[in-house]
Amino acid sequence: GNLDARRDWGHARDYVEGMWRILQQETPDDYVLATGETHSVRGFASRAFAAAGIELDWKGEGLAEKGVDAASGEIRVEIDPRYFRPAEVDLLMGDAAKARERLGWTHTRDLDSLVGEMVAADLELLGREGLPRAERMA
């Protein structure tokens, strides 16, 4: 997919807290729960590999761009055109000002802690179950 796409990633625990606060209101209303920060898919991938102890070097451009393990030279990330969205939105970012002002809600976890938690959970699962079935069959 598009490594340049920028997204507003946030932690589910923060969003559940926001939803709970919304449900406590006397009058129903619409709220946006978001971090107000964007990060590229490339940056997310770099953070995820770093959390697993792998530094990526990005080489090439466009469809030929690859994330290469800086230590081993092994290709870790390749672009697959099947994952490009037909109507790609380059930037998705929310404005949670209303939730902050009326609910006192704001996100409390940054992207690095989110990515670290996700990678740790995957590494734990990998340690318990080994490679996913599709990887074993390859």
Task: Write out the residue ranges for each language-model feature.
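C-terminal substrate-binding subdomain of Rossmann-fold SDR/epimerase-dehydratase oxidoreductases
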Residues: 1-138
